[in-house]
């Protein structure tokens, strides 16, 4: 699906001051107006601690120095330099360490100073203020009790428009570089705030008439088309799909990067936008399109682009979930098992930063639940350490699911699925109380229908494992089914155990039909003939692989020892 560039421009060109001013926010109720004015005065004239002033000035100087250096590099037709890399590293330290520590100390549950309050200290630097506001509103969404007001949701949207406008509509590459972690967080937060607003606007019960009028008169703010257009524009500007295509075929991505894609800012925003599109299409329930946007990303191979752990985890979570909903259980199990093993081995790395740990830990728990569902519906062998974790966490629930308990399926699905949303602006004159739950209930129904179709398969599988031949009528009697009903269930078993499975190639949509079922059968007249297809584990191959790895490591160490 393509989105015209002029659509994006019309959305992105919003004037940040175009929304109603202070007077328009008055309600006519003296008590409410007085409370609003007190809050406004409190925000405008708050005293900024000296340490925060010094930090903001240092932050501004670091960003300004980087921009000045980037301007010089662009004029000299250079992509980057050691000076730029050093400045990006300094900004990363500010972003990941200083900002977090000061937030914890001064603004744990309250907002940072407004951009207007710090503007004089940074010389009203427009670019820095946009970046500052991005952090400011993100903090309000994450930590401030009560969350963002309607006005703050709109202001944050306009600020993102200004940021993407600066990056996408400049005459030539924008003179800016940011750490990969911050670039990922920008895309991640942009989609999160859209998701949050989509659910917020559907909950009309506690909204005043003024807020309802405000929502009615601004249907294009946080509109799904503007969000999609931003992501597609970043993908197109960076030429990231062509770069990935060349990279995966062993070529040099720089050769096809183009004027913008050569720069880290555009390249990484383009890559992260692909993951953003994966997430957005999954939230909208379009799983085929979700995986299709990643057709040039080889998931089963380490990449130079996968340097941000949260991006890796998010990618695998949404790809795995999309596979699950597309009934590609074997692929879903492979994806979940791979990323859970990765998290298991690198967990200590995330514990250094609390906010990263919380996010990754939550998705880790959700993926365990989804893996439990997938393995119940499609039993197959997985890594022993992951299987052990799964038995500890969900052993009891997996047994109940195997017995066909729909309540457990629903419970785990509700806990582990994404927060689905509707792209359509609701009819504010007639919104029923549970309107915001409709996208979730629709996806739950699709999933529950699939579970219902497979309700008998676990029992049939356990009976088939006991015999090699058996009259169809006799086995039907064991299951309290008529012969005709049993034959239908056997056909369902054959159909559901056959999956489209990825075997090779770059696109995650590629695959061939396979069955990983441990039993197979055929019917000859009135007799069912059963074969155990379970392959005994070949330990010899495992040890041979480990010996080869050890020998390769030994050779590498010897070469390192020979260096002067």
Curated annotation (Swiss-Prot):
Keywords: Acetylation, Cytoplasm, Initiation factor, Protein biosynthesis. It holds the Pfam family Paf67. It is found in: Cytoplasm. One of its GO terms (molecular function) is translation initiation factor activity. One of its GO terms (cellular component) is synapse. PROSITE patterns: PCI (PS50250). Residues 331-537 form the PCI domain. The modification N6-acetyllysine is found at residues 465, 549. The modification N-acetylserine is found at residue 2. The keyword Cytoplasm applies. Component of the eukaryotic translation initiation factor 3 (eIF-3) complex, which is required for several steps in the initiation of protein synthesis. The eIF-3 complex associates with the 40S ribosome and facilitates the recruitment of eIF-1, eIF-1A, eIF-2:GTP:methionyl-tRNAi and eIF-5 to form the 43S pre-initiation complex (43S PIC). The eIF-3 complex stimulates mRNA recruitment to the 43S PIC and scanning of the mRNA for AUG recognition. PANTHER family: EUKARYOTIC TRANSLATION INITIATION FACTOR 3, EUKARYOTIC TRANSLATION INITIATION FACTOR 3 SUBUNIT L. Component of the eukaryotic translation initiation factor 3 (eIF-3) complex, which is composed of 13 subunits: EIF3A, EIF3B, EIF3C, EIF3D, EIF3E, EIF3F, EIF3G, EIF3H, EIF3I, EIF3J, EIF3K, EIF3L and EIF3M. The eIF-3 complex appears to include 3 stable modules: module A is composed of EIF3A, EIF3B, EIF3G and EIF3I; module B is composed of EIF3F, EIF3H, and EIF3M; and module C is composed of EIF3C, EIF3D, EIF3E, EIF3K and EIF3L. EIF3C of module C binds EIF3B of module A and EIF3H of module B, thereby linking the three modules. EIF3J is a labile subunit that binds to the eIF-3 complex via EIF3B. Belongs to the eIF-3 subunit L family. This is Eukaryotic translation initiation factor 3 subunit L. It comes from Mus musculus.
